[in-house]
UniProtKB/Swiss-Prot annotation:
Name of the encoding gene: tusA
Protein name: Sulfur carrier protein TusA
Lineage: Bacteria, Pseudomonadati, Pseudomonadota, Gammaproteobacteria, Enterobacterales
CDD domains on file: SirA (cd03423)
Subcellular location, record wording: Cytoplasm
Task of the protein: Sulfur carrier protein involved in sulfur trafficking in the cell. Part of a sulfur-relay system required for 2-thiolation during synthesis of 2-thiouridine of the modified wobble base 5-methylaminomethyl-2-thiouridine (mnm(5)s(2)U) in tRNA. Interacts with IscS and stimulates its cysteine desulfurase activity. Accepts an activated sulfur from IscS, which is then transferred to TusD, and thus determines the direction of sulfur flow from IscS to 2-thiouridine formation. Also appears to be involved in sulfur transfer for the biosynthesis of molybdopterin.
Amino acid sequence: MTDLFSSPDHTLDAQGLRCPEPVMMVRKTVRNMQTGETLLIIADDPATTRDIPGFCTFMEHELMAKETDSLPYRYLLRKKH
């Protein structure tokens, strides 16, 4: 089985940051990405378990994978547009 988290196009380490900073950084990073590129987000704020999926839904990006069973949390999104 392939680890989706192993080769993202971009990585954002948001560890130590608290809401709303992680999502603000994700938005800024995604804005500078090309359509179809992937972003690995590494975070430890419990609010990201709600905020990152919500961001993807609201902005219509694909949340390809998430690991939130233990810290740090990892999310992989694909820019859709």
